[in-house]
Design a protein with these regions (language model features):
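Basic, alpha-helical interaction scaffolds
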Residues: 153-192
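Conserved catalytic core of two-metal-ion nucleotidyltransferases
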Residues: 94-148
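Residues that form ligand- and interface-recognition hot spots within folded domains
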Residues: 42, 57-62, 66, 76-80, ...
Length: 350
Protein backbone atom coordinates (compact mmCIF):
# COMPACT_ATOMS: atom_id res chain seq x y z
CA UNK A 1 0.00 0.00 0.00
CA UNK A 2 1.55 3.29 -1.11
CA UNK A 3 1.44 6.39 1.06
CA UNK A 4 -0.53 9.44 0.07
CA UNK A 5 2.57 11.55 -0.50
CA UNK A 6 4.16 9.22 -3.04
CA UNK A 7 0.86 8.83 -4.91
CA UNK A 8 0.49 12.61 -5.00
CA UNK A 9 3.97 12.86 -6.49
CA UNK A 10 2.97 10.27 -9.09
CA UNK A 11 -0.27 12.19 -9.71
CA UNK A 12 1.69 15.38 -10.43
CA UNK A 13 4.04 13.54 -12.77
CA UNK A 14 1.07 12.18 -14.70
CA UNK A 15 -0.28 15.71 -15.10
CA UNK A 16 3.12 16.91 -16.33
CA UNK A 17 3.40 14.02 -18.80
CA UNK A 18 -0.07 14.70 -20.17
CA UNK A 19 0.63 18.43 -20.52
CA UNK A 20 3.71 17.60 -22.60
CA UNK A 21 2.26 14.83 -24.76
CA UNK A 22 -1.24 16.29 -25.32
CA UNK A 23 -1.95 17.69 -28.81
CA UNK A 24 -0.73 21.23 -29.40
CA UNK A 25 -2.78 23.67 -31.45
CA UNK A 26 -0.39 23.59 -34.41
CA UNK A 27 -0.51 19.79 -34.43
CA UNK A 28 -4.28 19.77 -34.58
CA UNK A 29 -4.21 22.45 -37.27
CA UNK A 30 -1.80 20.41 -39.42
CA UNK A 31 -4.06 17.37 -39.09
CA UNK A 32 -7.12 19.46 -39.97
CA UNK A 33 -5.36 20.60 -43.15
CA UNK A 34 -4.42 17.01 -44.00
CA UNK A 35 -8.08 15.99 -43.78
CA UNK A 36 -9.04 18.88 -46.07
CA UNK A 37 -6.41 17.92 -48.66
CA UNK A 38 -7.65 14.34 -48.70
CA UNK A 39 -11.26 15.51 -48.85
CA UNK A 40 -10.44 17.80 -51.79
CA UNK A 41 -8.70 14.93 -53.58
CA UNK A 42 -11.41 12.31 -53.05
CA UNK A 43 -14.53 14.33 -52.41
CA UNK A 44 -14.70 15.68 -55.95
CA UNK A 45 -14.69 12.16 -57.39
CA UNK A 46 -17.61 9.75 -57.66
CA UNK A 47 -16.20 6.56 -56.15
CA UNK A 48 -19.54 4.80 -55.95
CA UNK A 49 -22.02 4.16 -58.76
CA UNK A 50 -24.45 7.07 -59.00
CA UNK A 51 -23.63 8.43 -55.56
CA UNK A 52 -21.26 11.08 -54.23
CA UNK A 53 -19.59 10.91 -50.85
CA UNK A 54 -17.47 12.64 -48.24
CA UNK A 55 -14.46 12.14 -45.97
CA UNK A 56 -15.19 11.81 -42.25
CA UNK A 57 -12.84 11.55 -39.27
CA UNK A 58 -13.01 9.17 -36.35
CA UNK A 59 -10.83 7.74 -33.62
CA UNK A 60 -8.26 9.53 -31.49
CA UNK A 61 -7.85 12.60 -33.73
CA UNK A 62 -11.32 14.20 -33.42
CA UNK A 63 -11.49 13.04 -29.80
CA UNK A 64 -8.18 14.80 -29.02
CA UNK A 65 -6.79 11.59 -27.50
CA UNK A 66 -3.77 11.06 -29.76
CA UNK A 67 -0.02 10.95 -29.24
CA UNK A 68 2.26 13.11 -31.46
CA UNK A 69 3.02 10.39 -34.03
CA UNK A 70 -0.43 8.75 -34.01
CA UNK A 71 -1.95 7.81 -37.34
CA UNK A 72 -5.15 9.29 -38.78
CA UNK A 73 -8.33 7.24 -39.14
CA UNK A 74 -10.64 8.42 -41.91
CA UNK A 75 -13.60 6.96 -43.75
CA UNK A 76 -15.08 7.76 -47.14
CA UNK A 77 -18.86 7.46 -46.86
CA UNK A 78 -21.40 7.67 -49.65
CA UNK A 79 -24.16 10.24 -49.29
CA UNK A 80 -26.67 7.39 -49.16
CA UNK A 81 -24.96 5.77 -46.18
CA UNK A 82 -24.35 9.10 -44.45
CA UNK A 83 -28.03 9.99 -44.73
CA UNK A 84 -29.16 6.75 -43.11
CA UNK A 85 -29.43 4.42 -46.10
CA UNK A 86 -27.61 1.16 -46.80
CA UNK A 87 -24.01 1.10 -48.09
CA UNK A 88 -23.56 1.52 -51.83
CA UNK A 89 -20.89 -1.20 -51.75
CA UNK A 90 -20.14 -3.84 -49.13
CA UNK A 91 -16.85 -5.70 -48.92
CA UNK A 92 -18.56 -8.82 -47.63
CA UNK A 93 -20.92 -9.16 -50.61
CA UNK A 94 -18.84 -7.70 -53.46
CA UNK A 95 -15.19 -7.92 -52.48
CA UNK A 96 -13.87 -7.47 -56.03
CA UNK A 97 -15.77 -4.23 -56.70
CA UNK A 98 -14.91 -2.93 -53.25
CA UNK A 99 -11.22 -3.64 -53.77
CA UNK A 100 -11.24 -1.94 -57.18
CA UNK A 101 -12.75 1.16 -55.60
CA UNK A 102 -10.05 1.29 -52.93
CA UNK A 103 -7.29 0.82 -55.51
CA UNK A 104 -8.63 3.64 -57.69
CA UNK A 105 -8.85 5.95 -54.68
CA UNK A 106 -5.29 5.08 -53.61
CA UNK A 107 -4.02 5.82 -57.12
CA UNK A 108 -5.78 9.18 -57.01
CA UNK A 109 -4.14 10.06 -53.69
CA UNK A 110 -0.73 9.18 -55.11
CA UNK A 111 -1.33 11.08 -58.35
CA UNK A 112 -2.16 14.35 -56.57
CA UNK A 113 0.94 14.05 -54.39
CA UNK A 114 -0.68 13.28 -51.04
CA UNK A 115 0.07 9.59 -50.55
CA UNK A 116 3.56 8.16 -50.38
CA UNK A 117 3.53 4.48 -51.43
CA UNK A 118 -0.15 3.77 -50.69
CA UNK A 119 -1.29 0.19 -50.47
CA UNK A 120 -4.65 -1.49 -50.07
CA UNK A 121 -5.33 -4.09 -47.39
CA UNK A 122 -8.26 -5.76 -49.09
CA UNK A 123 -8.57 -8.92 -47.02
CA UNK A 124 -8.93 -7.23 -43.64
CA UNK A 125 -12.25 -7.40 -41.79
CA UNK A 126 -12.51 -3.70 -42.63
CA UNK A 127 -10.55 -3.12 -45.89
CA UNK A 128 -8.45 0.05 -45.85
CA UNK A 129 -6.01 2.19 -47.79
CA UNK A 130 -2.79 2.78 -45.84
CA UNK A 131 -0.24 5.44 -46.71
CA UNK A 132 2.13 8.05 -45.33
CA UNK A 133 1.24 11.67 -46.07
CA UNK A 134 4.08 13.32 -47.99
CA UNK A 135 3.72 16.71 -46.30
CA UNK A 136 3.25 15.82 -42.63
CA UNK A 137 4.81 12.36 -42.51
CA UNK A 138 1.74 11.08 -40.67
CA UNK A 139 0.36 7.61 -41.34
CA UNK A 140 -3.21 7.54 -42.63
CA UNK A 141 -5.81 4.75 -42.80
CA UNK A 142 -8.89 5.27 -44.97
CA UNK A 143 -11.81 2.86 -44.90
CA UNK A 144 -14.91 3.01 -47.08
CA UNK A 145 -18.63 2.73 -46.27
CA UNK A 146 -18.25 2.03 -42.56
CA UNK A 147 -19.65 4.55 -40.07
CA UNK A 148 -19.07 2.56 -36.89
CA UNK A 149 -16.04 4.63 -35.91
CA UNK A 150 -17.82 7.91 -36.62
CA UNK A 151 -20.78 6.87 -34.50
CA UNK A 152 -18.44 6.24 -31.57
CA UNK A 153 -17.40 9.91 -31.38
CA UNK A 154 -20.50 10.91 -29.41
CA UNK A 155 -19.68 8.14 -26.95
CA UNK A 156 -16.12 9.46 -26.52
CA UNK A 157 -17.44 12.97 -25.87
CA UNK A 158 -19.88 11.67 -23.27
CA UNK A 159 -17.16 9.69 -21.49
CA UNK A 160 -14.78 12.67 -21.50
CA UNK A 161 -17.43 14.70 -19.68
CA UNK A 162 -18.37 11.94 -17.23
CA UNK A 163 -14.86 10.68 -16.49
CA UNK A 164 -12.34 13.55 -16.67
CA UNK A 165 -9.50 11.26 -15.50
CA UNK A 166 -9.91 9.31 -18.74
CA UNK A 167 -7.82 11.78 -20.77
CA UNK A 168 -4.74 11.37 -18.60
CA UNK A 169 -5.12 7.62 -18.33
CA UNK A 170 -5.47 7.18 -22.10
CA UNK A 171 -2.23 9.07 -22.74
CA UNK A 172 -0.36 6.96 -20.18
CA UNK A 173 -1.68 3.57 -21.25
CA UNK A 174 -1.19 4.33 -24.94
CA UNK A 175 2.41 5.38 -24.31
CA UNK A 176 3.06 2.26 -22.24
CA UNK A 177 1.85 0.06 -25.13
CA UNK A 178 3.39 2.14 -27.94
CA UNK A 179 6.85 1.64 -26.45
CA UNK A 180 6.30 -2.13 -26.52
CA UNK A 181 4.73 -2.40 -29.97
CA UNK A 182 1.31 -3.40 -28.61
CA UNK A 183 -0.85 -0.49 -29.73
CA UNK A 184 -1.80 -1.53 -33.27
CA UNK A 185 -4.73 -3.83 -34.02
CA UNK A 186 -3.25 -4.99 -37.34
CA UNK A 187 -0.30 -6.46 -35.40
CA UNK A 188 -2.56 -7.96 -32.71
CA UNK A 189 -2.24 -5.17 -30.16
CA UNK A 190 -4.88 -3.05 -28.44
CA UNK A 191 -6.48 -0.33 -30.54
CA UNK A 192 -7.39 3.09 -29.22
CA UNK A 193 -11.08 2.26 -28.76
CA UNK A 194 -10.24 -0.87 -26.77
CA UNK A 195 -7.84 1.07 -24.55
CA UNK A 196 -10.47 3.72 -23.86
CA UNK A 197 -13.07 1.08 -23.03
CA UNK A 198 -10.71 -0.69 -20.61
CA UNK A 199 -10.07 2.59 -18.82
CA UNK A 200 -13.71 3.66 -18.69
CA UNK A 201 -14.84 0.24 -17.49
CA UNK A 202 -12.25 0.29 -14.73
CA UNK A 203 -13.28 3.78 -13.58
CA UNK A 204 -16.95 2.79 -13.65
CA UNK A 205 -16.54 -0.25 -11.42
CA UNK A 206 -13.57 0.45 -9.16
CA UNK A 207 -13.61 2.34 -5.90
CA UNK A 208 -13.19 6.05 -6.57
CA UNK A 209 -9.49 6.83 -6.76
CA UNK A 210 -7.95 9.51 -4.57
CA UNK A 211 -5.88 10.86 -7.45
CA UNK A 212 -4.42 9.91 -10.83
CA UNK A 213 -1.54 8.03 -9.24
CA UNK A 214 -3.95 5.84 -7.32
CA UNK A 215 -6.13 5.37 -10.42
CA UNK A 216 -3.23 4.39 -12.70
CA UNK A 217 -1.75 1.94 -10.21
CA UNK A 218 -5.18 0.39 -9.65
CA UNK A 219 -5.75 0.06 -13.40
CA UNK A 220 -2.43 -1.75 -13.87
CA UNK A 221 -3.15 -4.11 -10.99
CA UNK A 222 -6.70 -4.91 -12.06
CA UNK A 223 -5.99 -5.72 -15.71
CA UNK A 224 -2.49 -7.04 -15.05
CA UNK A 225 -3.31 -9.34 -12.15
CA UNK A 226 -7.03 -9.63 -11.39
CA UNK A 227 -8.78 -9.67 -14.76
CA UNK A 228 -9.08 -13.19 -16.19
CA UNK A 229 -9.16 -13.08 -20.00
CA UNK A 230 -10.39 -16.66 -20.15
CA UNK A 231 -13.42 -16.00 -17.96
CA UNK A 232 -14.51 -12.38 -18.28
CA UNK A 233 -15.65 -9.96 -20.92
CA UNK A 234 -16.61 -6.31 -20.74
CA UNK A 235 -19.95 -4.72 -21.57
CA UNK A 236 -20.01 -0.94 -21.93
CA UNK A 237 -23.72 -0.21 -22.28
CA UNK A 238 -25.01 -0.73 -19.67
CA UNK A 239 -21.72 -1.04 -17.76
CA UNK A 240 -21.07 -4.59 -16.58
CA UNK A 241 -18.45 -7.31 -16.32
CA UNK A 242 -19.85 -10.50 -17.79
CA UNK A 243 -18.77 -14.08 -17.41
CA UNK A 244 -17.71 -15.90 -20.55
CA UNK A 245 -19.52 -19.22 -20.82
CA UNK A 246 -18.56 -21.92 -23.28
CA UNK A 247 -18.60 -25.68 -23.56
CA UNK A 248 -14.96 -25.65 -22.56
CA UNK A 249 -15.20 -23.39 -19.55
CA UNK A 250 -17.99 -23.55 -16.98
CA UNK A 251 -17.80 -20.29 -15.08
CA UNK A 252 -17.87 -20.06 -11.32
CA UNK A 253 -15.76 -16.93 -11.09
CA UNK A 254 -16.87 -13.96 -9.00
CA UNK A 255 -14.70 -10.92 -8.50
CA UNK A 256 -14.46 -7.16 -8.60
CA UNK A 257 -17.97 -5.99 -9.48
CA UNK A 258 -21.33 -6.37 -7.82
CA UNK A 259 -22.77 -6.07 -11.30
CA UNK A 260 -21.27 -9.37 -12.51
CA UNK A 261 -23.67 -11.05 -14.89
CA UNK A 262 -23.67 -14.31 -16.83
CA UNK A 263 -23.99 -14.71 -20.58
CA UNK A 264 -24.58 -17.90 -22.53
CA UNK A 265 -23.18 -16.70 -25.85
CA UNK A 266 -20.46 -14.49 -27.25
CA UNK A 267 -20.76 -10.89 -28.34
CA UNK A 268 -21.05 -11.77 -32.02
CA UNK A 269 -23.30 -14.77 -31.45
CA UNK A 270 -20.46 -17.27 -31.64
CA UNK A 271 -18.78 -19.24 -28.87
CA UNK A 272 -16.57 -17.06 -26.71
CA UNK A 273 -12.82 -17.46 -27.05
CA UNK A 274 -11.29 -18.33 -23.70
CA UNK A 275 -7.97 -16.73 -24.61
CA UNK A 276 -8.94 -13.38 -26.13
CA UNK A 277 -10.17 -10.01 -24.93
CA UNK A 278 -13.88 -9.37 -25.45
CA UNK A 279 -15.32 -5.85 -25.26
CA UNK A 280 -18.84 -5.24 -26.48
CA UNK A 281 -19.15 -2.19 -28.72
CA UNK A 282 -21.46 0.27 -26.93
CA UNK A 283 -22.87 1.41 -30.28
CA UNK A 284 -23.12 -1.96 -32.04
CA UNK A 285 -23.93 -4.66 -29.54
CA UNK A 286 -23.04 -7.58 -31.81
CA UNK A 287 -19.51 -6.28 -32.39
CA UNK A 288 -16.46 -7.25 -30.32
CA UNK A 289 -14.24 -4.20 -30.75
CA UNK A 290 -11.19 -6.07 -29.47
CA UNK A 291 -11.72 -9.14 -31.63
CA UNK A 292 -8.52 -8.50 -33.60
CA UNK A 293 -6.34 -8.03 -30.51
CA UNK A 294 -4.81 -11.49 -30.52
CA UNK A 295 -1.89 -10.26 -28.38
CA UNK A 296 -4.12 -8.94 -25.60
CA UNK A 297 -2.54 -11.34 -23.11
CA UNK A 298 0.87 -9.79 -23.86
CA UNK A 299 -0.56 -6.33 -23.21
CA UNK A 300 -2.03 -7.47 -19.91
CA UNK A 301 1.34 -8.95 -18.95
CA UNK A 302 2.83 -5.52 -19.62
CA UNK A 303 0.29 -4.04 -17.21
CA UNK A 304 1.29 -6.59 -14.57
CA UNK A 305 5.01 -5.92 -14.94
CA UNK A 306 4.45 -2.15 -15.00
CA UNK A 307 2.44 -2.37 -11.78
CA UNK A 308 5.21 -4.27 -10.00
CA UNK A 309 7.94 -1.95 -11.27
CA UNK A 310 5.97 1.16 -10.36
CA UNK A 311 5.03 -0.19 -6.92
CA UNK A 312 8.69 -0.99 -6.20
CA UNK A 313 9.66 2.51 -7.27
CA UNK A 314 7.07 4.08 -4.99
CA UNK A 315 8.13 1.90 -2.07
CA UNK A 316 11.77 2.86 -2.58
CA UNK A 317 10.78 6.52 -2.50
CA UNK A 318 8.85 5.99 0.73
CA UNK A 319 11.91 4.38 2.29
CA UNK A 320 13.97 7.45 1.45
CA UNK A 321 15.99 5.83 -1.31
CA UNK A 322 17.17 7.96 -4.21
CA UNK A 323 15.02 7.17 -7.25
CA UNK A 324 15.93 10.13 -9.42
CA UNK A 325 13.74 12.96 -10.62
CA UNK A 326 10.98 10.78 -12.10
CA UNK A 327 8.76 7.95 -10.89
CA UNK A 328 7.20 7.24 -14.30
CA UNK A 329 10.59 6.91 -15.99
CA UNK A 330 10.82 3.32 -14.79
CA UNK A 331 7.97 2.30 -17.13
CA UNK A 332 7.77 4.97 -19.86
CA UNK A 333 11.27 6.41 -19.84
CA UNK A 334 13.01 6.29 -23.20
CA UNK A 335 13.84 8.12 -26.40
CA UNK A 336 11.16 10.61 -27.40
CA UNK A 337 13.03 12.01 -30.40
CA UNK A 338 10.32 10.77 -32.79
CA UNK A 339 7.79 13.00 -31.02
CA UNK A 340 10.11 16.00 -31.11
CA UNK A 341 10.89 15.50 -34.81
CA UNK A 342 7.23 15.03 -35.72
CA UNK A 343 6.22 18.13 -33.80
CA UNK A 344 8.97 20.18 -35.41
CA UNK A 345 7.84 19.03 -38.85
CA UNK A 346 4.21 19.95 -38.18
CA UNK A 347 5.18 23.32 -36.66
CA UNK A 348 6.81 24.38 -39.95
CA UNK A 349 3.73 23.68 -42.09
CA UNK A 350 2.14 26.99 -43.12
Amino acid sequence: MQSGLTLVRLHNEILDFYDWVAPQQYEHSARDKLVKRISDALGSQRWFPQDNGRILCFGSYPAGLYLPTADMDLVYASDRLYNGGPPVLESATDRAAFTRTLRKASQRLQKVGIANNPFVIAKARVPIIKFKDRLTGLDVDISFENLSGVQAQATFDQWKNEYPDMLYMVALVKQLLVMRGLNEVHTGGLGGFSIICLIVSYIQHAKKAENLGDCFLGFLKYYGKDFDLSRKRIQMNPPAVLNKVSSRCADTYHNFSTNLLQSTYGIDGREESDTGLSIQDPNKLDNNISGGSRRAAEAFNVFSAAHDTLADRLKASELGQEIGPSILACIIGGNYDSYLKQRHRLSTIP
